[in-house]
Amino acid sequence: SGSAQQKKEYFNLNVTGIGYLSSIRRVNSGNGEFTCAVINALTGPTDNASYQRFDITVAGPENTKLINRCQKAVDEEEKVLIGFVLSGLKADVFTLQSGEHAGEARPSLKARLIKVDFIKKGQDMVYTAPNATQTPEPGSSAPKDYDPNSF
């Protein structure tokens, strides 16, 4: 009997958040066609949030379908807010192409979009994942439920 194929295990570093989707595009390469986009993730206090840009490559057929369905709304400059999980974070630098800061370099984080928790177009929730990661409402705090044998 042949030896069973060993399943490769990985250490995962994932980023979970919400942010605005923009610049959806399909890219053709030697590995086939895939979808890329930009997520400007919200970070900081809810009354004075700042943004962190992520240049993402969409992973998986279901996520690709969901992001491609947002193309029209994004092209028409509607606000598309998504709940997401990213993986495979890498630092990069990009150059601003337009505006008063055109030509200036800015930091960027590249990542793979591995899960879409929800999609909101304007004020309308248009998609919620069947097993969405529940994000507590801003300002709410769940009671702490400690294990009796906590460290």
Language model feature labels by segment:
Residues 1-151:
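Single-stranded nucleic acid-binding surfaces, predominantly the OB-fold ssDNA-binding core
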